[in-house]
């Protein structure tokens, strides 16, 4: 299972927001993530439009990208609670364990999700021990390799916290689908409350891009991690020698 971010970016007109929601519904999406945190009145307006378009039987998640301090996060989320968000992602600084715990306690039943900026198992362990997160968002490129990611997946299972990999980057959708499959097949055996982020751009640079159907990742059929980039893309964009950097 996956969630889409296509309608969630800041700065869209009401018409574009409605059109993106409708297009996502036609493709079978049932989970939508929305950026928030710059202006509460504007976020209320956007969330009202989104709920009008997708209804109340589909899930909405919010993402603040670390913009608040702890008290701001609590007060802001109290104003958005009427829209029944499933989680608030990165409400504050990613290494503020006790701050996340305070937010999680104050805004229940809304969950707290974080992890894309966490570099190792230690910070994840502290977040889990403090009951600071309801969703564990590993980032396969931020952390120290596959073994570090697997350690966090195993810890999350021990604490009963679903793993929802972060995939907002070049090739991350292709990469993290394999970790989600490992979690399901080898660790948790469950898809309940487990989602993989899907960002609908830059897949054309890979030989084996992800395949989506009705809001879900389809299992990859080629060997490897699905992240081999096309030679033309490397020639164009590799830093600092790519053609894109020489103009």
Where are these regions (language model features)?
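A broad, low-specificity signal for short, low-complexity segments enriched in glycine/proline
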Residues: 21-24, 97-98, 125-126, 181
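N-terminal capping/lid subdomain adjacent to the active-site entrance of alpha/beta enzymes
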Residues: 1-60, 65-74, 78-82, 202-247
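Catalytic core of soluble alpha/beta enzymes
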Residues: 34-174
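Structured C-terminal cap/extension of enzyme domains
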Residues: 143, 150-247
């Amino acid at each position: 299972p996956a969630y889409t971010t296509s309608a969630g970016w800041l700065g869209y007109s009401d018409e574009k927001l409605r059109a993106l929601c409708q297009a996502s519904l036609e493709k079978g999406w049932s989970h939508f993530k929305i950026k928030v945190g710059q202006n509460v009145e504007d976020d209320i307006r956007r969330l009202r439009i989104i709920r009008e378009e997708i209804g109340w039987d589909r899930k909405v998640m919010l993402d603040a990208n670390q913009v608040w301090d702890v008290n701001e996060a609590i007060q802001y989320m109290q104003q958005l609670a009427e829209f029944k968000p499933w989680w608030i992602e990165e409400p504050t600084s990613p290494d503020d364990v006790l701050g996340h715990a305070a937010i999680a306690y104050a805004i229940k039943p809304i969950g707290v999700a974080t992890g894309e900026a966490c570099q190792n198992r230690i910070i994840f362990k502290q977040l889990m021990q403090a009951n600071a997160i309801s969703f564990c968002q590993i980032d396969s490129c931020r952390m120290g390799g596959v073994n570090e990611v697997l350690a966090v997946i195993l810890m999350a299972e021990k604490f009963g916290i679903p793993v929802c990999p972060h995939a907002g980057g070049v090739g991350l959708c292709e990469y993290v689908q394999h970790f989600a499959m490992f979690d399901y097949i080898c660790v948790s055996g469950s898809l309940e409350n487990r989602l993989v982020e899907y960002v609908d751009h830059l897949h054309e640079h890979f030989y084996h891009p992800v395949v989506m159907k009705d809001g879900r990742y389809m299992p990859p059929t080629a060997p490897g991690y699905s992240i081999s980039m096309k030679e033309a893309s490397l020639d164009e964009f590799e830093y600092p020698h790519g053609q894109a950097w020489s103009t």
